[in-house]
């Protein structure tokens, strides 16, 4: 498969990008990767070693993301079992598998690397922006959570947008911890946090991504299903002199 590749060195300056061709040697579905990581299935040594390295890296990336102030809003996925006639026989909710989280963190890393380069070179693209929350909305969130006996973080009486961003992130941490410990409000309480935030959107100017605590963010990893990703591919390749296609300023 033809791809655009970014081998990223953590904490090592501007990333490298180049055109590449990959060969898929293993059919690593999410389910199989999860089974290998859990020790339920064996795979060639190089596959297991690569997966475990990626797992350690994604865990560290996730830790750093939350440490810098990213929101922690996690919702269990809905799963269904069907009977022979196609009807729903059973339904249940389960936490996101480690294999999903692993890929998610690496995708976030790639998206940030591309957006950081484009923003650093002042290149217009379609950035995925998420502006700081409105202080009044965050104050209302804290009041609602308190009414529901959910622990809330301290907040200044008059919050600036920067204060609101920090308090919202701390509230998301407390909500996640409360839900994990009490099993109460697994869907409703994270939804309250999300409703207090600005909606993420696309913009040709880089305005940062508050929810991810990213100074620059874009969608880059799914160009076959999202047009904004394709726009960012074109902008990146044009900026690096790897494309003959004309990209308007």
Regions found by a protein language model. Name each.
Residues 1-249:
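Electropositive polyanion-binding surfaces
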């Amino acid at each position: 498969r033809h791809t655009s590749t970014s081998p990223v060195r953590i904490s090592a300056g501007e990333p490298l990008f180049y055109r590449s061709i990959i060969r898929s040697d293993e059919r690593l579905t999410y389910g199989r990767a999860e089974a290998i990581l859990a020790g339920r299935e064996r795979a060639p040594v190089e596959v297991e070693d690569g997966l475990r390295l990626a797992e350690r890296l994604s865990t560290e990336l996730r830790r750093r993301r939350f440490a810098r102030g990213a929101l922690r809003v996690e919702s269990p996925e809905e799963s269904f079992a069907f009977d022979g006639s196609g009807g729903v026989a059973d339904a249940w909710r389960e936490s996101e598998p480690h294999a999903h989280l692993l890929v998610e963190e690496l995708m976030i890393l790639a998206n940030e690397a591309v957006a950081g380069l484009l923003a650093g070179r002042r290149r217009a693209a379609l950035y995925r922006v998420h502006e700081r929350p409105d202080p009044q909305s965050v104050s209302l969130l804290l009041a609602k959570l308190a009414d529901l006996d959910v622990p809330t973080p301290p907040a200044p009486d008059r919050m600036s947008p920067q204060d609101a961003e920090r308090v919202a992130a701390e509230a998301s941490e407390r909500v996640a911890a409360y839900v994990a410990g009490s099993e109460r409000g697994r869907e409703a309480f994270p939804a309250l946090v999300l409703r207090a935030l600005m909606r993420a959107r696309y913009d040709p100017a880089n305005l940062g991504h508050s929810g991810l605590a990213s100074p620059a963010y874009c969608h880059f990893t799914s160009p076959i299903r999202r047009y904004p990703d394709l726009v960012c591919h074109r902008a990146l390749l044009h900026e690096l002199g790897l494309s003959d296609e004309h990209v308007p300023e």
